[in-house]
Every structure is written in structure tokens, then in C-alpha cells.
């Protein structure tokens, strides 16, 4: 079933609001490479509870960053596993938004910040947990 433009816009606003929050985070090592960035984002991600999850679910987010490690503009969901139900997709969109909130203002090195500022970056989150029997 297709979602209305209003539903999509509302979810985008939720993602934007959560991702721009200045939530405190644990001290992290400076991020100097794309591999470091991916590891930092994955460390912030907590998949939905098992009862709301789907084994193998994938969700890809398109985002860009400022030089200082803050998100630039609002991130967009560009892919979600097709076989998931709308409730499962929603649970994963919320989990990704919360991950971006937890990762608000990443500690980029000056060189890395200069290199990636304003550039599009995609990150795919994969739920590789196994569903209990």
C-alpha cells in the first residue's frame, strides 16, 4: 500500500527533528575516514525490538554533513526492503532516526570535515539478527 505525501512528509520531519538534536554522546575518537564514519553511525544504531523486526531488513539513508560533523539538511530514506510490512518499515525508520539523533555532531578531523562537507553520503543499515524460533 502506498503512503500519502502527508505521511511521507511527517516521517521526514520526525527524522529531521531527531537527527538535529544536540543530544550528548559518549566521547569518540576523531573520525578521519569513511570507514570511521560508517563505524560511528553503526555504533549509534539499535535495531527495533525483535517483535517489530524483520530478519535481513535493509534501510538506506542519504545524508550529508557539515565540516564540523553535524548533519547538513535533512536525511532521506532512499531504500527499504520491499518484502517488509509498513509497520516493520516504520519501526526501522524510527530506529534510524534515533541513531542519527544519538550520533548528532560527529567528531570529524579537520581534514575529513573539509573533504566530506556537503557531499552526499549513503549508509545502509542491515538487521542481521536472527529471529528466535
Could you say what each language-model-derived stretch is?
Residues 1, 14-17:
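N-terminal targeting leaders that direct proteins to extracytoplasmic destinations
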Residues 10-13, 69:
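Domain-scale selection of a single, long terminal region
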Residues 48-54:
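Charged, well-structured alpha/beta interaction segments
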Residues 55-60:
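Short, small/polar residue-rich loop motifs at catalytic or cofactor-binding pockets
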